[in-house]
């Protein structure tokens, strides 16, 4: 996620035998230690982004706005198709050319290096909505959305980071390269080039180019952050009513198909992250399917219809994939 880096991980995990079992939802009392540099940085980014939004309606060239829209989608795909579904969950495999594309897209998103993002996300699934979860939604919307990046990590997060197996990630030279050269590589791709390109090719002003880059950046940040916050607090739970993650329609467009969060936490290894596959606006699944078609993505993992139906009947909240109620006695829960 965005800058709150503490090198807690090693490539090989330590034993969990001496650690207390955490049960969600959990939010034990704690003292928050604000990281003021992060607070000021996030504040500047958002103020600059709001000014960029103003410039879109007053002086920015249309080409600059179109470029920002395109780069925003690429940045989100760098998280959803790259750090999330490919590397964190290994829900499919990718050839080197596709991994290079995804690491460039991921750098556009600048939510720390992909390695840090993957570690935090694996912790999020292993200790979801407990004090071992870096963005514990049990602490409320603001904390899970961005507050966790503005304070020092919970002691449980620091302890349990050492239990996360990252050996597959550290054996990937593409991911190691991005982490090793994070400041120049990510800085160039996320901020410098998107500012220079409009100035060079169509004569945009520095102020317009920079502030619209900030707008694009904070929009992509908050789009992904909604999965941590809104999709853990609001929505319906067709697959498991006993967990916080929910199917949340408000995050549908912004997150390119990451809104089926109840499904994802039940079947995290499904590359579609949704029972609906690439139907509708699950653009991440469409992206992966395209590269599977040309042979750059392969070994795509999916949950079987039988497993999905069985889980819905056993632990679901009585809604179907669209959020409508169905009869638990019915043999057909999916339409």
Curated annotation (Swiss-Prot):
UniProt keyword annotations, A-Z: Fatty acid biosynthesis, Fatty acid metabolism, Iron, Lipid biosynthesis, Lipid metabolism, Membrane, Metal-binding, Oxidoreductase, Transmembrane, Transmembrane helix
Domain free text: The histidine box domains may contain the active site and/or be involved in metal ion binding.
Protein name listed in UniProt: Acyl-CoA Delta(11) desaturase
Physiological role: Catalyzes the formation of Delta(11) fatty acyl precursors in the pheromone gland, with a preference for myristic acid.
Keyword Membrane attributed: yes
Span of the annotated motif Histidine box-2: 121-125
Motif Histidine box-1: positions: 84-89
Compartments reported by the entry: Membrane
Any one GO CC term of the record: endoplasmic reticulum membrane
Superkingdom of the organism of origin: Eukaryota
InterPro entries: Acyl-CoA_DS, FA_desaturase_dom, FADS-1_CS
Catalytic class of the enzyme: oxidoreductase
A Pfam family reported for this protein in Swiss-Prot or TrEMBL: FA_desaturase
Family to which this protein belongs: Belongs to the fatty acid desaturase type 1 family.
Reported cofactor(s): Fe cation
MF annotations from Gene Ontology: acyl-CoA 11-(Z)-desaturase activity; iron ion binding; stearoyl-CoA 9-desaturase activity
Membrane topology (UniProt): Multi-pass membrane protein
Chain positions covered by the region annotation Disordered: 312-335
Catalytic activity: an 11,12-saturated fatty acyl-CoA + 2 Fe(II)-[cytochrome b5] + O2 + 2 H(+) = an (11Z)-Delta(11)-fatty acyl-CoA + 2 Fe(III)-[cytochrome b5] + 2 H2O
Biased composition (Polar residues): 321-335
Cited PANTHER family: ACYL-COA DESATURASE, DESATURASE 1, ISOFORM A-RELATED
Transmembrane feature ranges: 39-59, 64-84, 98-118, 182-202, 213-235
UniProt xrefs under PROSITE patterns: FATTY_ACID_DESATUR_1
Alphabetical GO biological process terms: fatty acid metabolic process; pheromone biosynthetic process; unsaturated fatty acid biosynthetic process
């Amino acid at each position: 996620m965005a800058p709150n880096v503490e090198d807690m991980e090693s490539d090989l995990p330590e034993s969990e035998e001496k650690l207390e079992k955490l049960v969600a939802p959990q939010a034990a009392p704690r003292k928050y230690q604000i990281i003021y540099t992060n607070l000021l940085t996030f504040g500047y980014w958002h103020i600059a982004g709001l000014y960029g939004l103003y410039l879109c309606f007053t002086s920015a060239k249309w080409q600059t706005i179109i470029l920002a829209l395109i780069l925003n989608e690429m940045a989100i795909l760098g998280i959803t198709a790259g750090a999330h579904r490919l590397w964190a969950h290994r829900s499919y495999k990718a050839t080197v050319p596709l991994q290079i594309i995804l690491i460039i897209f991921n750098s556009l998103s600048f939510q720390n290096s992909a390695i840090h993002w993957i570690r935090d996300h694996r912790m999020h699934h292993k200790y979801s909505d407990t004090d071992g979860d870096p963005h514990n939604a049990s602490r409320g919307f603001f904390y899970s959305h961005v507050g966790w990046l503005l304070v020092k990590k919970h002691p449980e997060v620091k302890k349990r980071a050492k239990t996360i197996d990252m050996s597959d990630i550290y054996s990937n030279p593409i991911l190691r390269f991005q982490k090793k050269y994070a400041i120049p590589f990510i800085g160039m791709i996320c901020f410098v080039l998107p500012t220079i390109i409009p100035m060079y090719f169509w004569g945009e002003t520095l102020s317009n180019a920079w502030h619209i880059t900030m707008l694009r950046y904070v929009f992509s940040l908050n789009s992904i952050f909604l999965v941590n916050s809104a999709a853990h607090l609001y929505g319906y739970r067709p697959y498991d009513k006993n967990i916080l993650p929910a199917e949340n329609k408000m995050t549908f467009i912004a997150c390119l198909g990451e809104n089926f969060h109840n499904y994802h936490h039940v079947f995290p290894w499904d590359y579609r992250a949704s029972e609906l596959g690439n139907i509708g606006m699950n653009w991440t699944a469409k992206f992966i399917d395209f590269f599977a078609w040309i042979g750059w993505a392969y070994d795509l993992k999916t949950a079987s219809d039988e497993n999905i139906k069985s889980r819905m009947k056993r632990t679901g909240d009585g809604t179907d994939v669209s959020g409508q109620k169905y009869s638990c006695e019915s043999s057909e829960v999916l339409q």
